[in-house]
Design a protein with these regions (language model features):
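Long, solvent-exposed extracytoplasmic domains/loops
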Residues: 72-184
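Secretory targeting signals
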Residues: 26-79, 146, 150-227, 248-328, ...
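Short hydrophobic, aromatic-rich alpha-helical segments embedded in or entering the lipid bilayer
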Residues: 359-383
Length: 423
């Protein structure tokens, strides 16, 4: 315990560590501010002039305008949403074949008359996409029968989409469909919508997770490498507790520091992020806010927590691997370069290899659950599967399973390899 306490103090007295901790804390309010600031709302004032408000004011206007189209979105509300759009389109000569992108539709008319049904109509169009091409019908093409059959069609759309992405019906795509529908059966219907949080907010949770893991990686880089660089490790290893006990203490101290930092920063970020919107919006179904093809039976708030937990598991795996690299490299600079390279490697693989091999490779890497374009956040809202023979494995399962194993593996290897180095 004495050595462990000394290692904690050593880390907290390091200038670079303190700077990185401060950066992690400052990023929380900065990133939490952006999603809400992007929101805009346009209306006509008493003089007939269009006025655009942004940020919190726009969110309040949107919530005020939502009317009956919130709470449980029943078949009656689906029909009412479709009728509202048809009445709106009928007010324009020839209708609106280009939808809201018609040049005759002003921003204020859209916001005040049909923006409150836009998300619902988009999900209806998505559910009735052509199973052979994946192309969704336009809003004008929707029928009352499709509105009343929306919820039963959602399951069929999941099935059609997985077959379309997987190259048709086969034993392995059947396995994927079975897993997806098993999860979708647990989705609460009718879907729930509460004004507030936006899809951008969910993406920012994933972005902040990546930045936290990046910061924690650089915090841990010098744990072993700094002594290797100055050759102080040769002296330390001559002491009675300078090998195994010191290695274990350093590993535990590093993991405790970055783990505590992650939990504190993530809690602060989620609190500030959701406070900038409206906590009521956390009850919205993912299937309405994001896509009907999301088969996770969770609300927006539950997904945010899940992303945070998944990020923590990935952090542990990445931290253990970083400690392993720190003990193997001769300088802090080389350890930093190697750690950063492995952190962004899943993103490189995602862009370079799109097939089944690429999915396996990026998910099995220690940092496979974080990234700007390839993270657990996107995988949890996608229908991507990796295949082993005829067995389908949903990518989030693969990411978290690999991270859990790698955390234990590399934590042990970090201590063993450092102790044996120089023998």
């Amino acid at each position: 315990m004495r050595i462990f306490t000394a290692e904690i103090k050593r880390l907290l007295k390091t200038r670079s560590v303190l700077i990185l901790i401060l950066a992690a804390l400052l990023l929380a309010p900065a990133l939490a501010y952006f999603p809400a600031s992007f929101e805009t709302w346009t209306y006509r004032d008493d003089s007939g002039q269009e006025v655009t408000v942004k940020g919190r004011d726009a969110l309040l206007k949107e919530a005020e305008n939502q009317g009956q189209f919130q709470g449980k979105i029943t078949e009656e509300k689906l029909l009412a949403a479709l009728q509202r759009w048809k009445d709106f389109a009928a007010g324009y000569e020839g209708g609106l074949p280009d939808g809201i992108y018609d040049e005759r539709v002003t921003a204020s008319d859209y916001c005040e008359k049909v923006s409150n049904v836009g998300g619902i109509l988009n999900r209806m169009c998505e559910a009735w996409a052509d199973p052979k091409t994946g192309i969704a019908p336009g809003r004008d093409d929707l029928t009352e029968e499709q509105a009343t059959g929306f919820y039963s069609q959602c399951r069929q759309h999941i099935k059609d989409l997985i077959y379309l992405e997987g190259g048709g019906e086969s034993a392995r795509t059947d396995s994927a469909v079975q897993q997806a529908l098993a999860l979708y059966d647990r989705v609460e219907m009718p879907f729930t919508y509460e004004p507030g949080v936006t899809p951008d907010a969910i993406e920012y949770v994933g972005i902040y997770v990546f930045l936290l893991v990046l910061i924690c990686t650089f915090i841990l880089v010098p744990v072993f490498a700094s002594d290797c660089q100055t050759q102080a490790d040769q002296i330390l290893k001559c002491a009675r507790d300078g090998r195994r006990r010191l290695a274990v203490s350093r590993i535990l101290a590093g993991l405790l520091l970055v783990g505590a930092l992650y939990l504190i920063c993530m809690a602060l970020f989620l609190l500030l992020l959701n406070a900038s919107f409206d906590f009521k919006g956390l009850d919205t179904s993912l299937q309405l806010l994001v896509s009907v093809s999301v088969f996770l039976p969770l609300t927006v708030g539950q997904l945010e927590l899940l992303i945070g937990v998944a990020g923590f598991v990935t952090l542990l795996a990445t931290a253990a691997f970083t400690l392993f690299l720190s003990g193997r490299m001769k300088t802090v600079a080389s350890a930093s370069i190697a750690a950063f390279a492995f952190l962004i490697l899943p993103m490189v693989v995602y862009m370079a290899l799109s097939g089944n091999i690429g999915k396996w490779l990026r998910c099995l890497l220690p940092a496979g659950g974080v990234g700007l374009i390839n993270s657990f956040t996107y995988a949890a809202m996608d229908t991507g599967f990796a295949y082993l023979g005829n067995t389908a494995i949903w990518l989030p399962y693969l990411m978290m399973g690999a991270a859990a194993v790698e955390f234990i593996l590399f934590a042990v290897l970090a201590g063993v390899s450092w102790c044996r180095r120089g023998k």
